[in-house]
UniProtKB/Swiss-Prot annotation:
A matching Pfam family: DAO
One Gene Ontology molecular-function label: D-amino-acid oxidase activity
Source species: Dictyostelium discoideum (Social amoeba)
Highest taxon of the lineage: Eukaryota
PROSITE patterns assigned: DAO
Purpose: Catalyzes the oxidative deamination of D-amino acids with broad substrate specificity. Has low in vitro and no in vivo activity on D-serine; primary D-serine degradation is performed by the D-serine dehydratase dsd.
Cofactors, names only: FAD
Residues noted as binding D-dopa in the record, renumbered to the chain: R284, G312
Residues given in the record as D-serine binding sites: Y227, R284, G312
Name recorded for this polypeptide: D-amino-acid oxidase
Segments carrying motif Microbody targeting signal: 344-346
Gene Ontology terms: cellular component: cytoplasm; peroxisomal matrix
Length: 346
């Protein structure tokens, strides 16, 4: 999709509403505004930065806890390219390039399904493997985001392009339909209630933010989750993925277990060598696969484009999914407009 403004879209301009103000909703809004195809673009959300799930994420570019893997690969590659073209050179974004290693204690001869989409993918060298690890992957040009800086950056970008943000909690999608014919649903876990999607559930993630730093991200998700993610101003240690757990309070038990696992993949981050700055908990929008599709309501007179269920890969697929979501809006508009034209003649 062309990120520059264009008037090639033959559909009449409409007022577009996006529900949700995490990295998915904001990215989608920015892509919509850059297209120049909409009369206005607004975001309604129950929670705004810095109080979103996105603000509590480790924010490493790497496909993680997300399906379907073939499309995740495509959207991840598109997101990586967007970071390179539009974000990485802006210091206000809090985004930096860091090498990423995923490591394995057992031989892992198969490559990930998303490998064909990532040109920089390679097998890890022996010198990149900690003691006790025998195999691994490497990406030399991955990205990490300081989440608070990055989310503020997205808000500023959205508003500077003319976007409007309103803190508003929807309990019924029909509230949105009063003034909008097209809505993009980026509510994540909120889709469980707003759209009665019982296939989405929380994947509780707890992270530890420390002052120390390192030169690469490293992760082990083979048996238990352990990762070290150096960001611009701090480093994140993680983590957990406790399915169907709604507890948003940090627990001492999880903190202790995270520190033990992290010390195994990177001994320099043993408990007695780090300075803890904080502990955060976020609920990942876990689902069997990302939902990115059109759904018509009220007999075909209203269109909802769903863009949720990104699991642990929200920052990894955000721009690719945003581009796809706006394509779906444009594809659904002719049917919507045809239906409304017929109704107006009755």
């Amino acid at each position: 999709m062309n990120q520059n403004k264009n008037n090639n879209n033959k559909n009449p301009k409409i007022n577009l509403l996006i529900i949700g103000c995490g990295c998915i909703g904001l990215s989608t809004g920015i892509i919509a505004l850059k297209s120049g195809n909409y009369k206005s673009v607004s975001i309604w959300a129950k929670d705004l930065p810095p109080n979103t799930t996105s603000n509590k994420a480790a924010a490493l570019w790497y496909p993680f806890l997300c399906n379907p893997l073939d499309l995740v690969g495509k959207w991840s590659a598109e997101t990586m390219q967007y970071y390179k073209d539009h974000i990485i050179n802006d210091p206000k974004s809090g985004t930096i390039t860091k090498k990423v290693n995923e490591i394995f204690r057992r031989p892992h001869p198969e490559d990930p399904e998303w490998k064909p989409y990532i040109k920089s993918f390679r097998r890890a060298r022996k010198d990149e493997l900690p003691d006790g690890y025998v195999d691994g992957y490497a990406i030399d040009d991955g990205f990490v985001m300081d989440t608070d800086m990055y989310m503020d950056y997205l808000v500023d970008q959205f508003k500077s392009l003319g976007g409007i943000i309103e803190q508003r909690h929807l309990v019924d999608i029909r509230e949105a339909f009063v003034d909008h014919d097209v809505v993009v649903n980026c509510t994540g876990l909120g889709s469980r209630e707003l759209f009665n999607d019982r296939t989405i559930y929380p994947g509780r993630g707890q992270i530890i933010v420390i002052k120390n730093s390192t030169d690469r991200s490293i992760m082990d998700e083979e048996d238990h989750i352990a990762y070290v993610i150096p960001r611009l101003t701090n480093t994140v240690l993680g983590g957990t993925n406790q399915e169907h757990d709604y507890n948003t309070n940090p627990t001492k038990k999880d903190t202790e277990e995270i520190l033990k696992r992290v010390a195994m993949i990177s001994p320099r981050f043993a408990k007695n060598r780090i300075e803890i700055q904080g502990v955060k908990v976020g609920l990942r929008p876990a689902r069997h696969e990302i939902r990115l599709e059109n759904e018509f309501f009220e007999g075909g007179s209203k269109l909802v484009v769903h863009n949720y269920g990104h699991g642990g890969s929200g920052f990894t697929v955000s721009w690719g999914c945003a581009i796809e979501a706006i394509k779906l809006v444009d594809q659904g508009l002719p049917k919507l407009l045809h239906f409304n034209k017929l109704i107006s003649k009755l």
